[in-house]
Amino acid sequence: TMAEWFVEGLVKRLAGWGDWSGDPVARKLYEHAVFYVVPNMNPDGSVRGNLRTNAAGANLNREWLAPDPERSPEVFAVREAIHANGCDMFFDIHGDEALPYVFVAGSEMLPSFTEHQLREQQAFIEAFKQASPDFQDRYGYEASKYKEDALKLASKYIGHTFGCLSLTLEMPFKDNANLPDERVGWNGERSAALGAA
């Protein structure tokens, strides 16, 4: 999936594989951070062709407030690990079927969202726009899209619980309208390049 390709690009850069051998950015990051990466949150969905649900029928991005070990063991295990280790920054990588753009959705609709989180979010957005021409912040979700069930979503739950920068990154399914490629559209290589950015 596009999220797995994104993570592949991220991991290759962090690990210094291939073209990223000896990457000074990755080396500097390792001086200050520990990374926990889940390369595929929904292996059932990947195998079965489900966009959001596991084999039990649970929409894994609506289970974060109260995951059930039987219905959503993936969320339960990852959430427990995050609570055990803490979290300073969280990214939930997705694809959006409708919007043909690369964008992030934050947690600014939550009453607990702080000025510090806003500054971190704005800094990330500006830095990522510089790192990848595929990323933009003009088009995306309205901040009011998730209100009632916001804490059921991974990035909203983590942002609220840990008070950290917590974003959902969305990629297009077909092509990026801001930087279209008529030959290949949006594909695994572009997802991986975005992850490496």
Q: Over which residues does each language-model region extend?
A:
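His/Asp/Glu-rich mid-to-C-terminal helical/loop segments that flank catalytic regions of hydrolases
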Residues: 178-197
